[in-house]
Amino acid sequence: MEIINNQNQYVPYNCLSNPENEILDIESLSSRSREQVAEISLGLTRFLLESLLPGASFGFALFDIIWGVIGPDQWNLFLAQIEQLIDQRIEAHVRNQAISRLEGLGDSYEVYIESLREWEASPNNEALQQDVRNRFSNTDNALITAIPILREQGFEIPLLSVYVQAANLHLSLLRDAVYFGQRWGLDTVTVNNHYNRLINLINTYSDHCAQWFNRGLDNFGGVSARYLDFQREVTISVLDIVALFPNYDIRTYPISTQSQLTREIYTSPVAEPGASLNANLQNILREPHLMDFLTRLVIYTGVQSGIYHWAGHEISSRTTGNLSSNIQFPLYGTAASADRAFNMNIHHSETIYRTLSAPIYSVSGGISPNRTRVVEGVRFLIARDNNLDSLPFLYRKEGTLDSFTELPPEDESTPPYIGYSHRLCHARFARSPVILEPSNFARLPVFSWTHRSASPTNEVSPSRITQIPWVKAHTLASGASVIKGPGFTGGDIMTRNNINLGDLGTLRVTVTGRLPQSYYIRLRYASVANSSGVFRHLPQPSYGISFPRTMGTDEPLTSRSFALTTLFTPITLTRAQEEFNLTIPRGVYIDRIEFVPVDATFEAGYDLERAQKAVNALFTSTNQRGLKTDITDYHIDQVSNLVECLSDEFCLDEKRELSEKVKHAKRLSDGRNLLQDRNFISINGLLDRGWRGSTDITIQGSDDVFKENYVTLPGTFDECYPTYLYQKIDESKLKAYTRYQLRGYIEDSQDLEIYLIRYNAKHEIVNVPGTGSLWPLSVENSIGPCGESNRCAPHLEWNPNLDCSCRDGEKCAHHSHHFSLDIDVGCTDLNEDLGVWVIFKIKTQDGHARIGNLEFLEEKPLVGEALARVKRAEKKWRDKRKKLEFETNIVYKEAKESVDALFVNSQYDKLKADTNIAMIHAADKRVHRIREAYLPELSVIPGVNADIFEELEGRIFTAYSLYDARNVIKNGDFNNGLLCWNVKGHVDVEEQNNHRSVLVVPEWEAEVSQEVRVCPGRGYILRVTAYKEGYGEGCVTIHEIEDNTDELKFSNCVEEEVYPSNTVTCNDYTANQEEYEGTYTSRNQGYDEAYESNSSVPANYASVYEEKAYTDGRRENSCEFNRGYRDYTPLPAGYVTKELEYFPGTAKVWIEIGETEGTFIVDSVELLLMEE
């Protein structure tokens, strides 16, 4: 058997036709030079993880480990590293220019560092202040000039490792300017400008590196050994450093910060150097997953060509902080049994930090040899948490292929078991295609590693800001997923696949130091919309947390996509181990959680910084001339609370300055709000303007949620009498072809209906669950000394900054405290004064709402499709309005004729003698056929035909009043039950046939009577409408005390009866009913109901921009609860009306109702004074 080493020729990756046959030519790739780059990069990463502290010492150290020791030869190594990995030669002039610039940056930085040392020794020396300012400016300018050269077009990828070094230097320099600037003599504006540059360049540099790293991976076209080398080496030399760039934000990270790198990288397949692999690597990469730690490795041994080798393995792991978890992975390779299985159990305090492998490449046979690539053995070196060495695990034999050549220690000055940089976390397996075996036989393990900064216990420091990626959760919730990180986050990130709110996964942390400890909680996230979630400190309490939008729906994740959101109130950790969970909607991406320790000085500075950011974020520019469109009035109030809670002791001047800016923002907000009485000074208090509402609405002062007045809308027991609040936006305030937005804040609500009405009704029903008081039970100072809400006390921040925006073609997300609805305005007409109606309504018993900070403001001009859509809607609305006008003229004419026929003259002060109640009902019905007298959404708001309806309805009321004046019997229609009637025995008043009240006399001994005052000598007509059931007679008698008695009798009409000439028979009444048709329907029936006079032209003009985009709420209103209107239906068959003339001789008469047998049902009793 012949052992062959380094027999094959180096072939560039982009020339390979079959990546499985790739050759590992380590010598031609200058492995030692690449190892040196890795050592320098790992040392820098360690330095950034441990020592990225404010102060001059950081700059001194950065110079000592990088810029003071690296010369042209070392910079050339950086350039050669990626150049060799991707087989792309950097042109000579680009290389020379890059090295020259890097040397110049080193020289300039050295001069700056020297001036910084001198100034630090004498910080009040103005000459030294001037000198350090000059040196800073020189180095800053040199970096501004050099960095574009280090991203030369066409060479962005091979220049990455030197680009990131220059970027890191620039960020460090700018952080110095922000930290020392005022002590150097720089003014506040200049310092703030440098800070803004710092934040902008963190994003710019991060995105550049991540973009070109990912493009470099894509260029390989698939996973190969060279792909793994590039992923590993460029992650170490570029992305690990980029992941720590955000820590240069000194205002966000003013103290030492503990970061973790959770990314996973791969060492080369364990194969003899120089031997072609002939193994498939496409399935080597692991899918994104929660970070795990190796707990058990079982290796199976096979034999091929007489060589015992690693044939397959099984792995078990656990998640972070959960010793009891056991993740078992499927078998990799085969469970061969040429020797007994090697079982390796790793204690939770142990780490495999190094492997020494024994690969072999064997060629046997003659003309057609068999080539075998296998691993004969591996020594696994173990480190313990207490920095002690541990006995290694040995699988069969130790080799010379050292993982340290690819993953060197981060600290060469200490023993390897202390200074190591990575821990083994997993192993996968590559094998030759079956079709090539046995002539080409390969069984090769591939190890994956994580950085040692990612601790297995999620320790939270009492004195440092602790960053913990959420992929270090110990469980993954259903519907949540881990996705590949964008490259600049130091690992993978998490999100949810389900559109509904759901959990992300449970994170367990270990609190170090003395207990209890208090921390501010921050989350680094990205979001495609203004969203909200819930942060749970298990088992309780829960905190609402906002995720304001940071990116568009179709945008890629960039560094600028990520932001920090903070719980308003610090939390206190009282146990050595704590657990947290996070509930988020789809479209929110979570990178990490941050624990910021709280102390008095730091807390004051932190609060000031947060307030400054919040205030500056209100405006469109630094001069505070314009307010951002998406800044709500409620948000301004919350920012005002932040400012008011600043410490007078630590930052009184800054507090006053910020307070003035917030007041200016509030004035700008008021100025753009088109609503009147935006602070709810009164309801129904301003004539023809301001808010109108039902009497049960209350205005309440500020509380722990609202800084200003808000309104409470209670439920109602009858949907025909809803609770309502409305206001009209006058046409004069609106601009043509413009979109407007109604928005506000809902503390809680149930069945709250919100309308915007112009050409159509924009309608939403919003249910927002409340949580009661914001103050935890443990907080005793939630009330101020004068009874006011203490908004500075710790509270549960359940009010998320979520936009419930209902736009064209989008679904509105309910159950959010913030809401907004849009409406588009077409052409404006001051004469027509259509305006926009804003309506809030509740029509259920369980309904309720507390709302405030309402705004109606201009959003944007309409263009393109939106403009065409509103023009179309406007035209449809006007066409239907014309149809309505035509039909209204017809209906009005008929109704007016019916009304006029009731009276003797045009003064409408006297009814005709033959006018009866059926005629008035018939006329009233015709009046109520007038459409659009009131808005169907809320019938207290006048519609387009309100004037003519009110005109005729007023005359109908007059007719009722005159008729009531003629009828001297009180409550003769029994609408008020038995009021004014004397009762003997058992009788009932029942409501029949849709609101008709009738008197039911079921027993012969029962009697109903009423004493009536009359004018002696005048004539009266007694008119009774009634129905007799069963045998016997029903009688209505009129009489004086002793004499002058008359009566009307009712029976089943089985036989033809002869009545006096002054009575009306059954047939006569039926004829009257047909003539007057004393029934009518609701005055606000839907548009689809046609008028009887012209049923072929319905007036349904509830136009919408898109028929499916708006709720067509303008169809029907079945409630007739105002203007005294009742829906009288015709009498059922069998009822008859009878009359008699009566001339009393005294001032009192008695009306008595009774029966002889069966049941007597009386609809109405009238005693009418005859005309003289």
Curated annotation (Swiss-Prot):
Keywords: Sporulation, Toxin, Virulence. SUPFAM superfamilies: delta-Endotoxin (insectocide), middle domain (SSF51096), delta-Endotoxin (insectocide), N-terminal domain (SSF56849), Galactose-binding domain-like (SSF49785). GO terms for molecular function: signaling receptor binding; toxin activity. It holds the Pfam family Endotoxin_N. InterPro entries: Cry1Ac-like_dom-VII, Cry_V, Galactose-bd-like_sf, Pest_crys, Pest_crys_Cry1Aa_dom-IV, Pest_crys_dom-III, Pest_crys_dom_I, Pest_crys_N_sf. GO terms for biological process: sporulation resulting in formation of a cellular spore; symbiont-mediated killing of host cell. The keyword Aminoacyl-tRNA synthetase does not apply. Coiled coil: none annotated. Toxic segment of the protein is located in the N-terminus. Belongs to the delta endotoxin family. Promotes colloidosmotic lysis by binding to the midgut epithelial cells of insects. This is Pesticidal crystal protein Cry1Ha. The lineage of its organism: Bacteria, Bacillati, Bacillota, Bacilli, Bacillales. The gene is cry1Ha.
